[in-house]
Amino acid sequence: AYTWNPNTNLVAVCDLNKEITDRIAEQYNVKTYNDVNEMLDNEEIDAVSIATPDAFHMDPALAAIRHGKPILVEKPLATTSEDAKKILAEAEKYNVRVAVDYHKRWDPAAINVRNELQNEESGTPIRGYMCMDDIIDVPTEWFNWADKSSPVHFLGTHCYDQIRWYMGCEV
């Protein structure tokens, strides 16, 4: 997606798997690395996007933060409170911005719901509830990291974020 945005310049990509980085280098004509610290040491990077599997966000996040780079982490920030607290503590220590990509906030239907709830005539919401009614087959056999995450992490987290956003409060 970054290659489609005229306001971004994809500088480098890092993945532990050399086969993946070789394919990306050829497909996107971009420098690739298999070590995040090497990439951060050698490239002029304004910000880092972290799109590792859910349970593996912490190490690249901490590396980028320690290099003073703001990060955008695919949701969820972490799969444990301990990892999330470590990331946020380091971000505070290094005065680095951390953002989590809760992209449902940009869906037109979600924006309409929030706007309606912000309307004075709607009153003040006192309770939030969301349900994902669709039967979604999560292809856990495709993910070699599936045992380290769950649908709550990669799907349910949207519900928590939307309730918080809709109601203007922390959950």
Could you tell me what each predicted segment is?
Residues 5, 42-43, 107:
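Acidic-histidine catalytic/liganding microenvironments
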Residues 23, 38, 47, 59, ...:
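Alpha-helical elements of Rossmann-like donor-binding domains used by nucleotide-donor carbohydrate transfer enzymes
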Residues 30-90:
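Beta-loop-alpha module in the N-terminal Rossmann-like domain of NAD(P)-dependent dehydrogenases
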Residues 97-99, 104-171:
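Predominantly a Rossmann-like dinucleotide-binding segment in NAD(P)-dependent oxidoreductases
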Residues 7, 44, 121-124:
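Glycine-centered tight turns that cap/initiate beta-strands
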Residues 1-28:
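N-terminal Rossmann-like dinucleotide-binding module
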Residues 1, 9, 20, 35, ...:
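Hydrophobic alpha-helical segments typical of transmembrane helices
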Residues 12, 46-47, 127:
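Short, Asp-centered acidic motifs that coordinate Mg2+ and/or phosphate
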